């Protein structure tokens, strides 16, 4: 069985109710600036996050996300740049292949990027996968930006 990584999952299974709640918050302009998804590894938290991000970033595009069927439009330029990890509105933080923790330099780079203006008027997202691997220095630096977010 071939398992795709969450960033490449174009269809969302079993988490539609959660996505509906997130998209409703977004449409009603009541979504928070921080969302924590918690649960066992492998249940689809990252996949859900990528689907929500695709929904938001393609809402005014020709190749929109399909919220009725929970399908990402593979023709979407946003999807392609997200899949290639080159989307300017998405920053992904995770452990590097050779590391067992998310280090302070990754968080410093995140903070530096968040202090810069966006290239477009679309929302920006930060996805921290495996947040339990943050070391103490990383946690403290991240808490500062979470407690005192800038206007970007």
Task: List the model feature ranges, each with a label.
Residues 1-137:
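Clamp-loader machinery-focused feature within the broader ASCE/P-loop NTPase space
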Residues 115, 140-152:
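Conserved catalytic/switch belt of AAA+ P-loop NTPases
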């Amino acid at each position: 069985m071939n398992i795709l990584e969450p960033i490449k999952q174009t269809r969302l299974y079993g988490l539609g109710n959660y996505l509906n709640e997130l998209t409703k918050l977004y449409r009603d302009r009541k979504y928070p600036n921080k969302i924590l998804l918690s649960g066992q590894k492998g249940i689809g938290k990252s996949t859900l996050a990528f689907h929500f991000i695709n929904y938001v970033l393609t809402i005014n595009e020709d190749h929109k996300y399909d919220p009725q069927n929970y399908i990402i439009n593979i023709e979407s330029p946003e999807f392609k740049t997200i899949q290639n990890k080159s989307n300017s509105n998405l920053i992904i933080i995770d452990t590097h292949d050779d590391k067992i923790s998310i280090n302070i330099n990754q968080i410093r780079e995140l903070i530096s990027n968040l202090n810069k203006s966006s290239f477009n008027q679309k929302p920006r997202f930060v996805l921290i996968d495996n947040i339990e691997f943050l070391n103490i220095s990383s946690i403290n630096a991240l808490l500062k930006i979470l407690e005192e977010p800038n206007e970007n």
